[in-house]
């Protein structure tokens, strides 16, 4: 049995010893059946939150309104969630009410896909009321119950379906795909932050080309930030070898290179990305558009290591040669890496010239910066002084 389950087993055993049902549920059970790596587990129980808190010494109310209590066991943290049913979904994401129950099957019934509605007990026996194992065997992504109802409850489930297709190389069953196509407009009610998470997971999947084909077939791109009408760009984007990526930044750079938005900053901000990512990708954009492989010393200097490394990463994804080592060597060989590395400062210029401060100081330092980069002058204080026409002291 997987070590992750074995380590968490005492949590289930404490709950069952206290007279409650407890199971491993969701993605961890699915991934176990698929022999995929399991990083963490989710636990569902018939114990109500207050009952869970009585059983364990160390607990945290991380989502108690929805029945989730985080418990600490053997220096590990586990989310333990009470079986529940949910009321109507008025905003296509959150239920109007949550009701705690004692039935495992009713709890599994509210989940998105049958492959995610399998439970495993403390003896590692599987409880599979919706034939999730059969779906896994057939590589099918099938909604629990009516697909249209599941998507109406949480519109993000449509994007999750496409993401699972990419990650698992599965296929949506016909009813689920039809419901996805007919209800795709509900995606507009989903927060951008949640969409961004699913988008990144989808791109990283081994079956990204098939996932992108389905995404475009159902016109999901219409409801993704800045991608309406970009079928051609997304087809190209989906054809690249994203298995070679090492950073998420490369995904965003690849997207702006194919879409070529009028305002790269605004496009990236619409995806609610961190400012650091927006700044890096925006700076790398013009270099990446040219599929730059050969760089002048001045270009390496102004771009910086983070930018030329990102452009090189995207080139690899697009089937070009990996020039990282050569570029890094050329960058390290530069006489300076920023204006701060110059052997003199504006204060030196004022002292040597006897003149007042003004725009000329920046202009002179810019000229010197270029001269040092082009090897016209060594970055040495006395040589710079002579080069600028000042007499040595």
Swiss-Prot record:
Cofactor: Mg(2+)
Catalytic activity: a tRNA precursor + 2 CTP + ATP = a tRNA with a 3' CCA end + 3 diphosphate; a tRNA with a 3' CCA end + 2 CTP + ATP = a tRNA with a 3' CCACCA end + 3 diphosphate
Record bears the keyword tRNA processing: yes
Residues that, per the record, bind CTP: 27, 30, 111, 154, 157, 160, 163
Signal peptide start-end: none
GO MF term (any one): CCA tRNA nucleotidyltransferase activity
Keywords attached to this entry: ATP-binding, Magnesium, Metal-binding, Nucleotide-binding, Nucleotidyltransferase, RNA repair, RNA-binding, Transferase, tRNA processing
Superkingdom of the organism of origin: Bacteria
GO BP term (any one): tRNA processing
Entry annotated with the keyword Metal-binding: yes
Other facts noted in the record for this chain: A single active site specifically recognizes both ATP and CTP and is responsible for their addition.
Description of how the protein assembles with itself and partners: Homodimer.
Record-linked NCBIfam families: PRK13299.1
Protein's job: Catalyzes the addition and repair of the essential 3'-terminal CCA sequence in tRNAs without using a nucleic acid template. Adds these three nucleotides in the order of C, C, and A to the tRNA nucleotide-73, using CTP and ATP as substrates and producing inorganic pyrophosphate. tRNA 3'-terminal CCA addition is required both for tRNA processing and repair. Also involved in tRNA surveillance by mediating tandem CCA addition to generate a CCACCA at the 3' terminus of unstable tRNAs. While stable tRNAs receive only 3'-terminal CCA, unstable tRNAs are marked with CCACCA and rapidly degraded.
Protein name in the entry: CCA-adding enzyme
